[in-house]
Swiss-Prot record:
GO terms for molecular function: rRNA binding; structural constituent of ribosome. The gene is rplV. This protein binds specifically to 23S rRNA; its binding is stimulated by other ribosomal proteins, e.g. L4, L17, and L20. It is important during the early stages of 50S assembly. It makes multiple contacts with different domains of the 23S rRNA in the assembled 50S subunit and ribosome. The globular domain of the protein is located near the polypeptide exit tunnel on the outside of the subunit, while an extended beta-hairpin is found that lines the wall of the exit tunnel in the center of the 70S ribosome. Keywords: Ribonucleoprotein, Ribosomal protein, RNA-binding, rRNA-binding. Pfam families: Ribosomal_L22. GO terms for biological process: translation. It comes from the Bacteria. This is Large ribosomal subunit protein uL22. One of its GO terms (cellular component) is cytosolic large ribosomal subunit. Part of the 50S ribosomal subunit. Belongs to the universal ribosomal protein uL22 family.
Amino acid sequence: MENTARAILRYAHLSPYKARQVINLIRGKDIATALAILSQIPKKSARIVEKVLKSAIANAEFKGMDIDNLYISKIHAEEGPMLKRYTPKAHGRATMIRRRFSHIYVYLAEKQQEDK
């Protein structure tokens, strides 16, 4: 794990389902391709994931890793806590409003150079 850099965003105001839709598009890609893909997606989740990815890139640069040789080795979104509220409905009923949060994890690694 010495050749990895990570960034974690906790309590993002975003449901994990919506975050995973964007995350699945960039999993395993190199960082230049991933940033290009994220910049073209018109979703709030793309902006949030892009911010976390840029943070991971900055962490990798701080650790002295080669920025041009990085790829997304692992990325996932987990479910955070849920705020539960109730809204009144017809005939005296109430339904629950679930405000979902996410924890987004991004791990970057350097590509291994093959000797020939």
